[in-house]
Amino acid sequence: MWFKHHKLIFFTLTVVLCNCGEVKPEALTIGEKKCDHCSMSIVDMRFHTQLITYKGKRYHFDAIECADQFINQKQMKPKQIWVSNYLQSNEFIPKENAIIIQTNKIRSPMGGGLAAFKSHEDTIPFQN
């Protein structure tokens, strides 16, 4: 009985600790995945957006617009959303910390002109 009790405690701690780790965005290669909303290949990494659910499911999008529409259609509350820094596409920014602008000076994959930046200063050359 004592051994079974300790096995249960060990199993519970393992599950809890595995779920407490920091979740980070995945690096992709161009064309490796398709957008989970519109099914276009993700080829322009400046617009790559990722989200993860509270259950650990990860979704990839070719544009911020697709992620927003996906969330609204599914009526979901993601655990985390990351957007690519337009100026440095291998860098992800948590969406809540990103400066997102809409401009006709940027051609995003879905045509919405949305792009994410790390700071307000970075957006100045792209403002209408």
Go through the PLM ranges and name each one:
Residues 17-19:
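C-terminal motif of bacterial Sec signal peptides marking the signal peptidase cleavage site
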